[in-house]
């Protein structure tokens, strides 16, 4: 049996909990960790699109163009754009006669 869970035990005619009024540091720490975990999980579910979009796109600065001639920067930008445009072409329209 785990020390971190509350166990209901029959006490006379009522059901009670052994952890009520406990000053056990392990039980207190487990309760705090459980509450923090619940709060973080709720925030994650509420804002997961914002959070993961920020990590996926916001933190990527791309390669540095410092010291690269402007003509090469333009060529690189065009290559990147054509790669994005080519990726959009994976949808194929099929016409049946």
Swiss-Prot record:
It is found in: Virion membrane; Host apical cell membrane. Keywords: Disulfide bond, Glycoprotein, Host cell membrane, Host membrane, Host-virus interaction, Hydrogen ion transport, Inhibition of host autophagy by virus, Ion channel, Ion transport, Lipoprotein, Membrane, Palmitate, Phosphoprotein, Signal-anchor, Transmembrane, Transmembrane helix, Transport, Viral ion channel, Virion. This is Matrix protein 2. A lipid is attached at residue 50 (S-palmitoyl cysteine). Residues 59-88 are annotated as: Disordered. It comes from Influenza A virus (strain A/Puerto Rico/8/1934 H1N1). The keyword ATP-binding does not apply. Changing residue 27 to T: In strain: A/Puerto Rico/8/34/Mount Sinai/Wi, A/Puerto Rico/8/34/Mount Sinai/Wi-M2-P10L and A/Puerto Rico/8/34/Mount Sinai/Wi-M2-P10H.
